Amino acid sequence: MAGIVSAFVTFFYRFISFTTSYVQCVRSIIAEHAGPHGWFL
């Protein structure tokens, strides 16, 4: 049981870190294309 919880926490933590880096990458790309009008960031 503890192994399942540990695996789930590890997966959740990796998912959060991956999502955070992905969002930052998308925001940087949008900022480059939006120029001074980055109103939706």
UniProtKB/Swiss-Prot annotation:
Superkingdom of source: Bacteria
Protein name: Uncharacterized protein TP_0811
